């Protein structure tokens, strides 16, 4: 029977509690149970006067509001303040009464500019959330993946000027110069005067600078959009996809440049370096490979395809003999090491007399040259070791897991938490946005882990579910003890062929297996080769 709707019901009085209006399974209830936010008060109390002035708004309340904005992808603080006054669940999470108004959007802006501008509060909050993740066993610390993503700055790409910027020497330049001097000493050549390597006071390169946001960088890369951007270099742990480090640079800085700093930040946050790190092909660099080897980290780096488009033979047609340190041309003639350049490349030259009558001379080098030259970086051996490992079955498994960790983390941040665009001007505000976004994503990992444990403990009382859960956990334990996992069937460890004597020695450690990616069950992987193993021709 159709009933008429009573009018004026909005004007009736009811006795209700805010606690009753928020569903038990609401996301914010889970966040409240999983995360302890009380540390924010201790973190910020020194920024407030203890005995003078008007009573301030609790800093924990302000940052809880910011967390709501990042968690639900609310980019505008005006919109966020409006949502707090209209959304009952938001009021409950902030500890407000039903009729109490939340802080104004200008209050958040004023505190950011006047109180939280120069003390890295956002980074400290991220560190504390990460500490809670580590404390609850969500971070393995063995296998990490690092990558970068571009974030559109609040700057018009047409409003720019050009300035001359002095080139900053790379962190590894001193070590590279020492290796170059050793090379030249072996060849009986005079060492370079490396003081000439320092950029002159008036030197440098022309660089586009935005007149709106001078701290961002113009991005000019193949396959990337043109304009002014920032780059976030993010490192995630493979166990539960927890973000363990965030580093922000202008987009005109090469991805390779901040890697030494990133490794130091990871060591400071975790207390140790990982056993292996995965990178995409943008980090395919001999200096990075040497840095990883020096820190005893097994790298897994995407392989770059040969892109030689010239009319003469590319370097990939020449085979390198590790035992004799020579290159072999397609006609089976040797190219010998003759010198090392100031940039750190060893130059290998062929015999001009043999090249003179070679049937492939015109295909190998130009008519103005008398012999062929091939360059090899002084740290190329370290990069070759990584290339060899990445091509193995276990290396491919490690590399394939990269897109399910770091790529998924970036996709989540951009699609759900507003990281596609910078919210404010300046690299300091960009760092705050990246750190708080990463902190919110780690909070979601904490919530997921906590309520998975609660689910397993509650369903243990149901016989059928209890049996299934017990079988699932037993399978987890078997895999963590080192059982091998293939695409279809588990394989017993004793059935795996061990390395022959004299070959590359290896150790085994479990990594996440893509077959069980939904719950991060580990599978086996071949770790780094023994460092004492001699080089052999690939």
Protein language model features and the residues they cover:
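Basic, short loop/linker segments at the boundary and entry of helix-turn-helix/winged-helix-like folds
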Residues: 24-67
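Glycine-rich, N-terminal phosphate-binding loop and its surrounding beta-alpha-beta segment
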Residues: 61, 67-71, 75-78
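Anion-binding and metal-coordination hotspots
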Residues: 4, 73-86, 96-529, 535-538
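Short amphipathic alpha-helical interface patches used for protein-protein assembly/oligomerization
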Residues: 90-94
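Short secondary-structure boundary/capping segments within folded domains
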Residues: 19-21, 54, 224
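Generic alpha-helical segment signature
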Residues: 11, 24, 37, 58, ...
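A general alpha-helix detector
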Residues: 17, 61-67, 107, 128
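Hydrophobic alpha-helical membrane-insertion signals
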Residues: 1-29
